[in-house]
């Protein structure tokens, strides 16, 4: 473990780092590098031009310029979103809300599925499959699934458990996906069991199973070893890595804890937790683990949420364009 002064130095260095060209952080090797296509889609003048895009999308060595992909077609694809761990539990938290509004304005059928905020994978997989069957009955459009944090893992597990649904899916977009788990699941497992696991929440019950245990890196490694070869759906990774100014106050302690391992973290996951070798890397965005998927929830969270806006609708729709182009 690092001493207090050493940890403070790490935090200070991170505040000044990760803003310009340099090598990709360790552990981010992917099957396909689509950073150039994603930049072309996001940084277009009609979406997020110039300095605004540079503040949101990080640059690293090895990115190859690519033409802007054509806009995705609402006639071909339907969008399905799954929130992350605990998101359903807190009043005023609405994952993907602004993204869904934007997608529907563009003509897409887009839905956020209801899952238990403290459920294990198996329980939420069943809920996800039931909702997809109900919402898409009779709809011939292909599905693009979008999962935040643990929601990405639940979608992965659903694709394995329900190959009939997987046949209708063109892609899974993992947004700050906990694909490889997180060291925090090991470090804070006991604390979770004595606190958050027992607390009453308006939006969720105590849930089923042991969701934090399923986020331990060793458990995720075992999952990939068992199921990775059976997964045929392409997984696209959108990685979150915030500047110090974009950390939510409520996440600073978690960021500091993860900094014992690496400063390249979004306050809940290291960057290498968000990518697997078989995934397709879209890019690294300057956002913390919450802001990358959840709009600012208002005055109730004023003192615990980052005030720096993040253009989720533009980022997600650019990602959908790239994914749709790859699916043609």
Regions found by a protein language model. Give the residues of each.
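Glycine-rich His-Gly loop
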Residues: 82-85, 149, 177, 240
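Bacterial N-terminal signal peptides
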Residues: 6-14
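Short aromatic-enriched loop/helix-cap "lid" or pocket-rim segments at secondary-structure transitions
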Residues: 93, 183-188, 246-251
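Active-site catalytic motif of lipid deacylating hydrolases and related acyltransferases
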Residues: 70-143, 197
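Serine-dependent carboxylesterase/thioesterase catalytic core
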Residues: 126-225
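Flexible, membrane-associating and regulatory peripheral segments of lipid-active enzymes
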Residues: 16-91, 97, 101, 105-106, ...
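C-terminal catalytic-base region of ester-bond hydrolases, centering on the histidine
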Residues: 230-328
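Bacterial N-terminal signal peptides that target proteins for export
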Residues: 1-5
